[in-house]
């Protein structure tokens, strides 16, 4: 794979993706005017350029996380027929929007004579050329909105990681005394839980605080390697179990429309890599090959999504839980699967957290004297970790938080914004009416999913508080 660690390369992309957050508003306006006339050096250097297979691996890694393990429940919420078909449709729509984003960014780099523009810059420069005078005047707000959505999405991922770690750790600890080498199917029995899930979240908190204080790229690359190894090993064992018979029959092909709204949020959340498309292309040794990597990689990702979601739902039926790891049988083999995947998620937390921290921390530190810089740096990082933890404590429902984050921020970044950018970018260049209608319809579809999915997730959160309290005393053996 080369001498440069893969994570270090992607970390550079992610930091460049968000731009210079510490610049003042006055300075940013000056930099925009000057950058339009002079080329800007992009994040890719020839020595650091990544090969086809490396970009392919990064694309897979950026789209396989905790949301991936929630797809069986998502298929349950949509139905055995509607779920896989909808996953395919949403996947195709998301990839199309990624392609739109790439085309807009490529066009703007040529127009502005720059080597690279990130998502926020693409939004800002697109608005500067749109037909609306008001939007042209306030184009910088497009950059701020996208940056805010990216931060919310990344911190939302971190909150989901807290819940995932707590749920799996609770199950491992409370089932340890009757776990053996013989795998037994999991059946539901009502028993008194030893400790609440929230206790495990608070137990994990200090370890994650210590983890995020590590900022050395070489150490982070080691974390990335460990996360990749444990995640791939766990997924191999999970798929090995899912293909075994028996499977449930007579499962509903079409589910309730209200639960389908939860499916939409989960499906969009699972496509976590939309923010990585532009920086990954900028890091590629042969950028002209990136569309091939994108379509090949995302086709494989969608195939994995459909397989896991469908096989998982067929395997566990109505007992399907928020994460498929919670449905695995009781034996040391599959307890080790939970442990390995949890280790991978634990280290991935630091990688996901690194992105919003690189935006927020420098901005805050620049407001204090040098004597207080280190203290403020550590304090802000600690506060952000605590924020993600307390968010998980307040809403300890993994499936609903995944759906909420997906509906609120992921849908905007993946579906709503890119088509609007295409209209704004190419409006002055005689864009066809058919393309405008197509883009408007895609954005409206994404907006409907965002509003209705958010409403349904919030409704379920308020209505099922008592359900969670009852479920916290339920252990599976």
Swiss-Prot record:
What species was this sequence derived from? Mus musculus
Its placement in the membrane is given as: Multi-pass membrane protein
Please give the InterPro entries that the UniProt record associates with this protein.
AA_transpt_TM
An annotated GO cellular component of this protein is:
membrane
Name the domain of life this protein comes from. Answer: Eukaryota
Which family does the entry's similarity section mention?
Answer: Belongs to the amino acid/polyamine transporter 2 family.
Q: Which residues lie on this side of the membrane: Extracellular?
A: 76-77, 166-202, 247-259, 313-344, 396-399, 454-477
Q: Which residues lie on this side of the membrane: Cytoplasmic?
A: 1-54, 99-144, 224-225, 281-291, 366-374, 421-432
**What's a Pfam family this protein contains?**
Aa_trans
Per UniProt, the keywords (alphabetical) are: Membrane, Transmembrane, Transmembrane helix
Gene this protein is translated from = Slc36a3
Q: Where is this region: Disordered?
A: 19-43
The transmembrane residues are 55-75, 78-98, 145-165, 203-223, 226-246, 260-280, 292-312, 345-365, 375-395, 400-420, 433-453
Q: Where in the cell is it found?
A: Membrane
The tissues where this chain's protein is expressed are given as:
Specifically expressed in testis.
Mind telling me what this protein is named?
Proton-coupled amino acid transporter 3
In which residue ranges is the amino acid composition biased (Low complexity)? 19-40
Coiled-coil annotated residue ranges, if any? none
């Amino acid at each position: 794979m080369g001498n440069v660690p893969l994570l270090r390369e992607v970390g550079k992309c992610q930091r460049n993706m968000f731009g210079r957050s510490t610049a003042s508003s006055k300075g940013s306006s000056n930099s925009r005017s000057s950058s339009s006339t002079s080329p800007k050096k992009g994040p890719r250097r020839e020595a650091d350029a990544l090969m086809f297979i490396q970009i392919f691996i990064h694309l897979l890694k950026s789209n396989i996380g905790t949301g991936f393990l929630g797809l069986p429940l998502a298929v349950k919420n949509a139905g055995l027929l509607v779920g896989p078909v909808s996953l395919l449709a949403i996947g195709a729509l998301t990839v199309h929007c990624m392609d739109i984003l790439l085309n807009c960014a490529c066009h703007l780099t040529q127009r502005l004579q720059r080597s690279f523009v990130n998502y926020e810059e693409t939004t800002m420069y697109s608005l500067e050329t749109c037909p609306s005078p008001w939007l042209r005047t306030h184009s910088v707000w497009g950059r701020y909105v996208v940056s805010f959505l990216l931060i919310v999405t990344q911190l939302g991922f971190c909150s989901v990681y807290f819940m995932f770690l707590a749920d799996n750790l609770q199950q491992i600890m409370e089932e340890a005394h009757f776990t053996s080498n013989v795998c037994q199917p999991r059946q539901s029995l009502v028993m008194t839980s030893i400790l609440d899930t929230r206790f495990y979240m608070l137990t994990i908190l200090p370890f994650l605080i210590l983890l995020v204080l590590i900022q050395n790229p070489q150490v982070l690359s080691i974390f990335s390697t460990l996360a990749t190894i444990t995640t791939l090993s766990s997924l191999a064992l999970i798929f090995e179990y899912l293909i075994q018979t028996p499977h449930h029959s007579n499962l509903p092909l079409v589910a309730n429309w209200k639960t389908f709204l939860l499916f939409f949020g989960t499906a969009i959340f699972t496509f976590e890599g939309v923010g990585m498309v532009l920086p990954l292309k900028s890091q590629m040794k042969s950028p002209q090959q990136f569309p091939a990597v994108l379509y090949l990689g995302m086709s494989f990702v969608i195939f994995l999504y459909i397989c896991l979601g469908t096989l998982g739902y067929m395997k566990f039926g109505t007992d399907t839980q928020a994460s498929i790891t919670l449905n695995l049988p009781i034996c040391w083999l599959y307890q080790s699967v939970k442990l390995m995947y949890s280790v991978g998620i634990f280290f991935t937390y630091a990688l996901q957290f690194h992105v919003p921290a690189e935006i927020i921390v420098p901005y805050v530190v620049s407001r204090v004297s040098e004597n207080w810089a280190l203290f403020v740096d550590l304090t802000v990082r600690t506060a952000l970790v605590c924020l993600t933890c307390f968010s998980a404590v307040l809403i300890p429902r993994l499936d609903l938080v995944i759906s909420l984050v997906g509906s609120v921020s992921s849908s905007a970044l993946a579906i709503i914004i890119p088509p609007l950018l295409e209209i704004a970018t190419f409006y002055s260049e005689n864009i066809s009416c058919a393309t405008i209608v197509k883009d408007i319809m895609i954005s409206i579809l994404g907006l409907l999913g965002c509003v209705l999915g958010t409403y349904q997730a919030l409704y379920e959160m308020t209505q099922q508080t008592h359900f969670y309290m009852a479920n916290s005393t339920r252990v599976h053996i």
